[in-house]
């Protein structure tokens, strides 16, 4: 088993819970305020993690200008994506549509991996990309 497998499992569980809680919140809070609460809480959680690293002498947090730039772009995408999910749920979008939506993002990442990060293409990856895109179109019904 690869060294990152359990991190992937934890991330999948947490992001699954993230969408369930977003669905529950969407009918009880506006998308802007809800998105802000989500992202502020996320920032606070990361701050607690950084404090833990500092206090336990495990600090190994380096950065470059490019790293900060791409992190800012990531934050913009996460913030806008959170608002988009709030709006999706507020307008009656089903929670069951989220896996296909995320698969569309996965297809985008796989294409970027092949085109920009020189990850080897395989028939399995190409099929996964195609199925993810098909899944997005099936959501229209």
Task: Please identify what each model-predicted range represents.
Residues 12, 16, 20, 47, ...:
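Hydrophobic/small/kink-forming positions within alpha-helical transmembrane segments
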Residues 50-52, 102, 114-115:
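Alpha-helix boundary/capping detector
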Residues 106-123:
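C-terminal transmembrane-helix exit sites in multi-pass transporters
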Residues 10-11, 85, 105, 113, ...:
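Alpha-helical structural signal
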Residues 124-140:
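Hydrophobic transmembrane alpha-helices of multi-pass small-molecule transport proteins
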């Amino acid at each position: 088993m690869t060294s990152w497998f359990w991190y992937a499992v934890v991330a999948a569980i947490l992001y699954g819970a993230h969408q369930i809680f977003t669905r529950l919140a969407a009918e009880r809070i506006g998308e802007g305020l809800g998105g802000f609460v989500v992202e502020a809480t996320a920032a606070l959680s990361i701050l607690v993690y950084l404090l833990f690293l500092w206090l336990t002498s495990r600090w190994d947090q380096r950065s470059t200008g490019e790293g900060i730039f791409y992190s800012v772009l990531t934050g913009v995408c996460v913030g806008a994506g959170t608002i988009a999910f709030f709006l999706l749920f507020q307008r009656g979008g089903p929670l069951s549509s989220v896996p296909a939506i995320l698969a569309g993002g996965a297809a985008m990442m796989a294409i970027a991996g092949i085109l920009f990060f020189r990850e080897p293409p395989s028939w399995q990856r190409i099929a996964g990309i195609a199925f993810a895109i098909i899944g997005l179109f099936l959501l229209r019904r």
